[in-house]
Amino acid sequence: MTQFINGQWVAGLGHEVTSKNPANSEVIWSSKTATAEQVNTAVEAAREVQFDWFMLGFEGRLAIVEAYKTQLEEHKAEMAEVIAQETGKPQWETATEAGAMIGKIGLSVAAYNKRTGSSENDTPAGRAVLRHKPHGVVAVFGPYNFPGHLPNGHIVPALLAGNTVVFKPSELTPKVAELMLKLWEKAGLPAGVINLVQGEVETGKALASHEQIDGLFFTGSSRTGHILHQQYAGEPGKILALEMGGNNPLIIKGVKDTKAAVHDIIQSAYISSGQRCTCARRLYVEKGAEGDALLAELADAVKRIQVGAWNSQPQPFMGSMISETAAKGMVESQRNLLNLGGSSLVELTHLKEGTGLVSPGLIDVTQVIELPDEEYFGPLLQVVRYTDFDEAIKLANKTRYGLSAGILADSRDDYEYFLARIRAGIVNWNKQITGASGAAPFGGVGASGNHRASAFYAADYCAYPVASVEADAVSLPASLSPGLSI
């Protein structure tokens, strides 16, 4: 019973699917997918209760959300372990994700009040009141890299605003989604307010194309996001929020503390086995002796990165990639770059058949004439040597994406020069570019999104403004308009 529809756990009526721990291929979840008919039932259930959920009022909705927060706190260790088993990420990292899910509640409440609450002002024309209303029924499509935190960042703001939700998680992380819904159920969520439909592409298509949804919030690949954008092109009445990937640049310029620089590079490129949308994919290093020394130190540190299973002791820095297919895809991507003229500094290797375990890779692509503008979603960092700062910035901007970018530089002038010219939604200075604050917006430009920043700005796409001019009674104005006699 792995579909949660109208407050009931029901079996899927589609085909059999399984979820495996990518570090050892152990099956940890199995069920049948939701059919198009079950998706329709889920949407209808969400539609049926949406007005009642809205009319519960913000304080009533907040009470349920706060009860969910309590459940997350009580089950934090369980949530972290399920995320670790299903994604392959080390336990230290998934404990952080479970903590972020808890922290999202308070941040979402603050964002609701700051960005989409109510206000009123007296004007000569009457009392001007600003309110916000929910869109209605929204679909949430979750990713596998942060299967708890990222969909949570759509669902919580959507519910606070008064929407009801149909949640379609990644087919690679169904067990995490199931646990999330069990915690919502324990929190006392009314039937139909969140509905869970588990499945693969056909389930997602049935939900995305359903006529009765009012919006879709998606986190995932640029390819799928662009398909959704084309699908919604003729439906201006539906809100579409796309959070996609990036081919993210990191420039190194004039850094004295090379050990600190190496640390920030590793945290930018290899955390989560390179499976964060903000991970650095391209590293720009000055030509010359200082750049050579930095690269040598970086290569040595990359070789010594510990890789292991989610529960290995001592804990590794990198866990498994999401699947063996993903791991082999990274090996193939490295091979393609080598064939184009790249030079391996540290070889990425598939460590064990039947798993997603890979070692991190570092490749010099300076001699590649036409560097593919691809998001290699794994622990493979491309190095480009440069002689001119403007040239480095120009190359950094040579991408259709625009999610994150960063510079490690001792000079603030260099940072401000870079900041003014780089095209990205997240720009960091002397910090890893995988570091982002939940108290700030999160989103990119170009192929990285559609100008619907999430995180603190998620409240913006969860509600629409309603402007009113009000008076307590109908009254004649002091003077009538010309040509009127009443």
From Swiss-Prot:
CDD domains: ALDH_SGSD_AstD. Gene3D superfamilies: Aldehyde Dehydrogenase, Chain A, domain 1, Aldehyde Dehydrogenase, Chain A, domain 2. One of its GO terms (molecular function) is succinylglutamate-semialdehyde dehydrogenase activity. It comes from the Bacteria. NAD(+) binds at G220, S221, S222, R223, T224, G225. Its EC number is 1.2.1.71. It catalyses: N-succinyl-L-glutamate 5-semialdehyde + NAD(+) + H2O = N-succinyl-L-glutamate + NADH + 2 H(+). Pathway: Amino-acid degradation; L-arginine degradation via AST pathway; L-glutamate and succinate from L-arginine: step 4/5. One of its GO terms (biological process) is arginine catabolic process to glutamate. Keywords: Arginine metabolism, NAD, Oxidoreductase. InterPro entries: Ald_DH/histidinol_DH (IPR016161), Ald_DH_C (IPR016163), Ald_DH_CS_CYS (IPR016160), Ald_DH_CS_GLU (IPR029510), Ald_DH_N (IPR016162), Aldehyde_DH_dom (IPR015590), SuccinylGlu_semiald_DH_AstD (IPR017649). Belongs to the aldehyde dehydrogenase family. AstD subfamily. PANTHER family: ALDEHYDE DEHYDROGENASE-RELATED. Catalyzes the NAD-dependent reduction of succinylglutamate semialdehyde into succinylglutamate. This is N-succinylglutamate 5-semialdehyde dehydrogenase. It comes from Shewanella woodyi (strain ATCC 51908 / MS32).
